[in-house]
Curated annotation (Swiss-Prot):
InterPro entries: AAA+_ATPase, ABC1_TM_dom, ABC1_TM_sf, ABC_transporter-like_ATP-bd, P-loop_NTPase, Type_1_exporter. This is ABC transporter B family member 20. Residues 762-771 have a biased composition (Polar residues). It catalyses: (indol-3-yl)acetate(in) + ATP + H2O = (indol-3-yl)acetate(out) + ADP + phosphate + H(+). The chain crosses the membrane at residues 86-106, 141-161, 214-233, 238-260, 312-332, 353-373, 841-861, 881-901, 959-979, 983-1003, 1062-1082, 1103-1123. Residues 14-49, 676-735, 752-816 are annotated as: Disordered. Its main location: membrane. Residues 802-816 have a biased composition (Basic and acidic residues). The gene is ABCB20. Disruption phenotype: The abcb6 abcb20 double mutant exhibits compact rosettes that twist laterally and bow, showing increased leaf down curling and wrinkling, along with twisted inflorescence stems, twisted siliques, lateral organ separation defects, reduced internode lengths, and fewer secondary inflorescences. In abcb6 abcb20 double mutant, roots are short and twisted. All torsion phenotypes are associated with reduced auxin levels and reversed by auxin efflux inhibition with 1-naphthylphthalamic acid (NPA). Residues 20-39 have a biased composition (Low complexity). ATP 1 binds at residues 449-456. SUPFAM superfamilies: ABC transporter transmembrane region (SSF90123), P-loop containing nucleoside triphosphate hydrolases (SSF52540).
Length: 1408
């Protein structure tokens, strides 16, 4: 049995099937000679050429890439303490003992064969003596089994435990140093989770290298050394010859190993393109549906999968040939040694047992060396990872100063004196150049300027996130470099537009690591107008927030951030565009809290909207890193300089004059060559920049520039508006009607994870508190990925939330009850039935050879004992020739098995992926709103679940056929030779099977618990890194470390149980293997002793069952794998079989030739599928005539964007109808319907491709002239033409970065090119700054000109200058409707919403 595991049961380590390869390799849809079985028979030229080409590419890559830096192996254990060294020494001794046990068994196996051979003596006394000897040997094997149990247990337990202990120290040190780094580190390496993923992956590599891999290496080296010793002790000549053939076997495996690992890396890269296409399509599903590009996405995905064909086929080819030659050479080597062995038997220099022991001891020794060598890859990876981590651990911060001075009292006088500054990640770009600024104590100074003026860099310098390149930053006359860093930051309160919340309670987030009583925290919350909404929560201040808890609206986050600053009671206050992402009502509430906070404090305000800082004590105007103007609002207006220009530009976006614009549909040569910066002090890009040094005008207290120009440079730390806009407690996310997104630097947008609901009582129901109440009353809610709308909870809910959840859960449970049948899986692979037949033939042949080889070897050994002279030579020569022929056939059988089953699996994986992706794109938008169907989750399903289908069928079918034939042939041989011993072997089968299954299930269960703990620990770190600026500003690093160490301690406590459990399971399973072999031996001895079988029969049957034992167990050992992947299999067919609630492909639906554009929402009730308890629209009715432009305004969460979602038919109403030209939308073909609508979203979706492809995404057959005309109409042609590659410029990942305004103009050009009769605009300019907003507004004005039906969602007055009607929403109902003048006369909600645009004289203004 042990022999079979070493030679024919285990795959050599370098030839183990590469799971990652199968997970990414994708055969193409189109025919290929690689997939044609007949193509291979035509010659090997194509294959050889492909291999040669692949090898050449890999060599080129190796030449270009220098070897990575690594630490010495001994340094991996730098964090080990005395207890760790004890664990490693004990574990090493146990590993060596465990590795030696198999070879020791072989030594006794030789004795068993000798005893069996001599037990044929007729002497009764000698026969009894031999029987007693066999019983003793059986007991010896039992003792070996006990030793294996103990040593295996100790080996695994010690190495797992010490690995967890040492890596816990490494993690702790890494995180400690990471949190103390200056911000330039995060600018260089990113702070979006990459650092966290690096530490997680690197620590796992180090843990593997210094724990179980070391134990495995010692184990296998012990097998190697002891194998040589036993081999040479038994028969040194046979051992030496066997050793001489080893390099050929190793070479066969080594060559294939090189190709396999290189091809595995290449195929991962090849699949990355397909994965990117799928992720984009799913992430931007609304845009994809709006432009009806499902077919394009499916075609692109299927085409990109073709790239993996070459590598997938090569992998199957290399795997088949590599395994074939490795096994073939091993079998041929065995034939050679047995043939040579007859000479030593004939000469009396060795007996059969010694030859067998020497032969297999050396073979197992060689395999042990191979397995030991495979650990070097893990050692190298661990050393490389350790270099990266240890380099970080020894890195010192350039701004750390814990030994600096502490001022006795702080007045709050701040001065920037001749400051020069550049970000370390972009040293060639000057941000500040000779900057001077003085902030008097207890005064508020607002910094304004264009993008790239450097204003956003002032706060990081004040917080000492960075140090100036030249110059000084002074606090009360003292250079802040000389001050103790932690003390300095404790004097500064920071409130940002994007406040950070750790995954803690609200109480802990407000305290943020400081010792504060609950009364103090509540008082701070009251001052921040946050106490009321916190108290309304079920758990109040103990409510968990952050990624692992309750989701907060942006307004609520800002209030908590203000409360945090209030509790700090700082002398200096830094406000970084705090209200930039809020709507006007929410802005008013937050501004009141900020006004209280600013009293008596030195304050620096970074502002984008100039209307908010008119009351500041001083306003500092910046341009190109210098201070060019400074004074009060009135002084700067009178000056007529840059501030006046910026204010004029901002006001132009509020009350723009109507510009005569021709209908572009009437003129094919319409030109829009207007200056995009007109009226804003922005020069034409083609104009030369004339920059003169600003001069200080004495006497007026004002800086005046001699000449100004536009600086297009942006600071690395962009402070973009938050993606969520919030109102007061009675209001909610402005993007509650929309899809919450996180903007990334690669121009992609990633949907936020699922956000649970926040229920807050309506203002009418609130108790009296310090917070002002909102005049509106929708509930605060937040929703995950879809266009959420938030409304108050109506008294007539459609269904009970509990009932809904219960029903949903029951439905899912019902779906999970039934697993896909074997025949369902077989149907997927039916097109590859020929490959399956050829692969099955190879698997059957190779599986049968396992017991047949044991049978023939047993016959040779028998001849050693019973034959003499010429008869011995003839018999041994005959059987050795048969063994050699079996070796040759093994090469062919392995090639057939692995090559053709590999092709079958690759095509099956590709087909399943295409089916899944196609099925995903059939589903309605509501399906994607479910947290289980997030873009990341669905992308992972495409990448992994399809390979699980392959693994559950193709790969496992191959093994099952192989092992089944081994079992069948072994049982047939056993039953024919002696049924008694066969029954004993069958009786041990359930024991071995249950042992294997229990071991795998046990290990999986404990590993899952440890992995979950590591995941929770990583969340703590990831939260801190993502919010590193806030963590550092509030000196919360110690709090983060405390939380992280608590998680590590939990992991260590669990690892003790984890290591002991795994060690016990492993050792016990090994014990059963040896013990069952001992039982089989005892029964063999008993059968021979009592005359039930002859000598030759006993030796033959014992060896057959010994060789076949592993094959008997392995098919049953697959059960845990199948059970583990059951959910993945079900997931595949759940997606494929799902029937969408909104059918997109109903060819019988209406496709009328003309669209007049009349839209009506009639008595509509609507709630989002994931939030059925929240009624967003209630009995809602709205009628829009064809060609009419209607603006929809309202507070956050009133249901504005939901209207667009219903018109696009992303969702169907719960009650009522949505009509187009008098017909229900449900009657129209869905793709036809969407093809007649043009959608412009607040956050423009820009795909990672060229500008050209982004524009023609709307119409792929558009000509060059049509595309450029659309860009001109969208005011995009000018900036596109100025780019080096023009329309072929690649944007997004690995391309240029565009401003939000430029992205929006490209998105508008896309809609212009579509030329749809219905235009839907969803707050398209709300997140764009004033400079770009006017240019975008002009493009939108042009877009809606002509006979088009337009629905306009807006909260800016500039968006409503061309509208025919204005509809005001609140709580899912229309509360006001009419023109601007009529609504202004009512002095209602519309007036309150628009008042920040016009001031108190709103009713006197008219929109012309």
């Amino acid at each position: 049995m042990m022999i079979s595991r070493g030679l024919f049961g285990w795959s050599p380590p370098h030839m183990q099937p590469l799971t990652p390869v199968s997970e990414v390799s994708e055969p193409p849809e189109s025919p290929s000679p690689y997939l044609d079985p007949g193509a291979e028979s035509g010659g090997g030229t194509g294959t050889a050429a492909a291999l040669a080409e692949a090898d050449e590419e890999m060599d080129d890559q190796d030449e270009l890439e220098p070897p990575p830096a690594a630490v010495p192996f001994s340094q991996l254990f730098a964090c080990a303490d005395r207890f760790d060294w004890v664990l490693m020494i004990v574990g090493s001794v146990a590993a060596a003992a465990h590795g030696t046990a198999l070879i020791v068994y072989l030594h006794y196996f030789a004795k068993i064969v000798d005893v069996l051979a001599f037990s044929n003596d007729s002497s009764q006394q000698r026969s009894e003596h031999q029987f007693d000897r066999l019983v003793q040997l059986s007991l010896t094997i039992v003792y070996i089994a006990g030793g294996v149990f103990i040593s295996g247990w100790i080996e695994v337990s010690c190495w797992i435990l010490t690995g967890e202990r040492q890596t816990a120290v490494i993690r702790s040190k890494y995180v400690q140093v990471l949190l103390n780094q200056d911000m330039s580190f995060f600018d260089t390496y990113g702070n979006n989770g990459d650092i966290v993923s690096q530490v997680l992956s690197d620590v796992l590599l180090i843990q593997s290298a210094l724990s179980e891999k070391v134990g495995n290496y010692i184990h296998n080296m012990a097998t190697f050394i002891s194998g040589l010793v036993i081999g040479f002790v038994n028969c040194w000549e046979i051992a030496l010859i066997t050793l001489a053939t080893g390099p050929f076997i190793v070479a066969a495996g080594g060559i294939s190993n090189i190709f396999l690992h290189r091809l595995a890396e290449n195929i991962q890269d090849a699949y990355a393109e397909a994965a990117g296409i799928a992720e984009q399509a799913i992430s931007y599903i609304r845009t994809l549906y709006a432009f009806t590009n499902e077919t394009l996405a499916k075609y692109s995905y299927a085409t990109s999968l073709q790239a993996t064909l070459r590598y997938g086929i090569l992998i199957s080819l290399v795997q088949g040939l590599g395994l074939g030659f490795t096994y073939g050479l091993a079998i041929c080597s065995c034939a050679l040694q047995l043939w040579i062995g007859r000479f030593f038997v004939h000469n009396g220099r060795a007996n059969g047992g010694e030859i067998i022991a020497a032969l297999f001891a050396v073979i197992l020794s060689g395999l042990g060396l191979n397995q030991a060598a495979t650990n070097f890859y893990s050692f190298d990876q661990g050393r490389i990872a350790a270099y990266r981590l240890f380099e970080m651990i020894t890195r010192s911060s350039s701004v750390a100063n814990q030994e600096g001075a502490v001022l006795a009292s702080v007045q709050g006088n701040i001065e920037f004196r001749n400051v020069y500054f550049s970000y370390l990640s972009r040293p060639e770009i000057p941000i500040l150049s000779g900057f001077y600024l003085t902030v008097p104590a207890k005064k508020a100074v607002a910094l304004v300027g264009r993008n790239g003026s450097g204003k956003s860099s002032i706060i990081p310098l004040m917080e000492r996130f960075y140090d100036p390149t030249l110059g000084e930053v002074l606090l009360d006359g003292e250079n802040i470099k000389n001050l103790k860093l932690e003390w300095l930051r404790s004097q500064i309160g920071l409130v940002t537009q994007e406040p950070a919340l750790l995954s803690l309670s609200i109480r802990e987030n407000i305290a943020y690591g400081r010792d504060a009583t609950l009364d103090q925290i509540e008082e701070a919350a009251k001052n921040a107008h946050a106490h009321t909404f916190i108290s309304s929560l079920e758990k109040g201040y103990e409510t968990q927030v952050g990624r692992a808890g309750l989701a907060m609206t942006e307004e609520q986050k800002i209030k908590l951030s203000i409360a945090r600053a209030v509790l700090l009671n700082p002398t200096i206050l830094l406000l970084d565009e705090v209200t930039g992402g809020l709507d006007f009502e929410a802005e008013r509430i937050v501004q009141e809290a900020l006004d209280l906070l600013m009293l008596g404090r030195s304050t620096i305000i970074i502002a984008r909207r100039l209307s908010l800082i008119k009351n500041a004590d001083y306003i500092a105007v910046m341009e190109e890193g210098q201070l060019v103007e400074m004074g009060t609002h009135d002084e700067l207006i009178n000056l007529g300089g840059l501030y006046a220009e910026l204010l004029k530009c901002e006001e132009a976006t509020k009350l723009p004059r109507r510009m005569p614009v021709r209908n572009y549909k009437e003129s094919a040569v319409f030109e829009v060559e207007r200056d995009s910066s007109a009226g804003c002090g922005v020069q034409e890009p083609s104009s030369p920049k004339m920059i003169k040094s600003p001069s200080l005008q004495r006497g007026s207290g004002v800086f005046r520039p001699q000449e100004l120009c536009f600086d297009t440079e942006e600071s690395p730390k962009a402070h973009s508006p938050a993606s969520e806009k919030t109102g007061e407690d009675g209001m909610s996310l402005d993007c509650a009607d929309k899809e919450p997104t996180i903007k990334r630097q690669d121009s992609f947008e990633m949907r936020l994870p699922h956000l649970p609901k926040v229920d807050v009582q309506c203002p009418q129901q609130k108790s009296n508190g310090s917070e002002p109440e909102s005049p509106v009353s929708p509930l605060l809610t937040s929703d995950p990925k879809n266009e959420r709308s938030h409304s108050q909870t109506f008294s007539r809910p459609l269904s009970s939330p509990d009932d809904t959840k219960a029903n949903g859960k029951a439905s899912k449970d019902a779906q999970h009850k039934e697993s896909p049948s074997f025949w369902r899986l077989a149907q997927l692979s039916f097109p590859e039935w020929l490959y399956a037949v050829l692969g099955s033939l190879g698997a059957a042949i190779f599986g049968s050879f396992n017991p047949l080889l044991a049978y023939v070897i047993a016959l040779v050994v028998t001849e050693y004992y019973k034959s003499k002279g010429g008869h011995l030579r003839e018999e041994v020569d005959k059987w050795c020739l048969i063994i050699a022929c079996m070796g040759i056939v093994t090469v062919v059988a392995n090639f057939l098995q692995h090559f053709y089953f590999g092709i079958m699996g690759e095509k099956m994986t590709e087909r399943v992926r295409r089916m899944m992706f196609s099925a995903m794109l059939r589903n309605e938008v509501g399906w994607f709103d479910d947290e289980e169907n997030s873009p990341d989750t669905l992308s992972m399903r495409l990448a992994n679940d399809a390979t699980f289908v392959r693994a559950a069928f193709s790969n496992r079918l191959s093994i099952f056929i192989q092992d089944s034939f081994a079992v069948i042939v072994a049982l047939l041989i056993g039953l024919l030779l002696g049924w008694r011993l066969a029954l004993v072997a069958l009786a041990t089968l359930p024991i071995l099977t249950l042992s294997a299954i229990a071991q795998k299930l046990w290990l999986a269960g404990f590993s899952k618990g440890i992995q979950e703990m590591h995941r929770k620990a990583s969340l703590v770190l990831e939260d801190a890194v993502r919010n590193i600026y806030t963590v550092v500003a509030f000196c919360a690093g110690n709090k983060v470390m405390e939380l992280y160490r608590m998680q590590l301690q939990r992991i260590l406590r669990q690892s003790y149980l984890h290591g002991m459990a795994i060690g016990f399971a492993f050792g016990f399973s090994q014990f059963l293997l040896f013990a069952c072999n001992a039982l089989l031996l005892w029964c063999t001895a008993l059968s021979v002793n009592r005359g039930y079988m002859k000598l030759s029969t006993a030796i033959t049957e014992y060896m057959v069952f010994s060789f076949a034992t592993f094959a008997l167990v392995e098919p049953f050992g697959l059960a845990p794998y199948i059970l583990k992947r059951r959910k993945s299999l079900i997931s595949v067919f759940e997606i494929v079989d799902r029937v969408p609630t909104i059918e997109p492909d109903d060819n019988s639906a209406l496709k009328p030739p003309n669209v007049y554009g009349s839209i009506e929402l009639k008595n509509v009730d609507f709630c989002y599928p994931t939030r059925p308890e929240i009624l967003v629209l209630s009995n809602f009715s709205l009628k829009i005539s064809g060609g009419q432009t209607v603006a929809v305004v309202g507070v956050s969460g009133s249901g504005k964007s939901t209207i667009i979602s219903l018109v696009e038919r992303y969702y169907d109403p719960v009650a009522g109808q949505v009509l187009l030209d008098g017909r229900d939308l449900k009657l129209y073909n869905l793709r036809w319907l969407r093809s007649h609508m043009g959608l412009v979203q607040q956050e423009p979706i820009i795909f990672s491709t060229t500008i050209r492809e982004n524009i023609i995404y709307a119409r792929h057959n558009a000509s060059e002239a049509e595309m450029k005309e659309a860009a001109r109409i969208a005011n995009a042609h000018h900036f596109i033409s100025s780019l080096p590659h023009g329309y072929d410029t690649h944007i997004g990942m690995r391309g240029v970065e565009l401003t939000p305004g430029q992205k929006q103009r490209i998105a508008i050009a896309r809609v212009v090119l579509k030329n749809a009769p219905i235009i839907l605009i969803d707050e398209a300019s709300s997140s764009i700054e004033s400079e770009s907003s006017r240019v975008v507004q002009e493009a939108l004005d042009t877009l809606i000109m002509g006979n088009k039906t337009t629905i306009l969602i807006a909260h800016r007055a500039a968006m409503m200058r061309h509208v025919d009607n204005i509809v005001v929403l609140n709580g899912g109902r229309i509360v006001e409707e009419g023109t601007h003048d009529s609504l202004a006369a009512k002095n209602g909600l519309y007036v309150r919403l628009m008042q920040p645009h016009f001031g108190k004289g709103l009713r006197q203004h008219r929109l012309i």
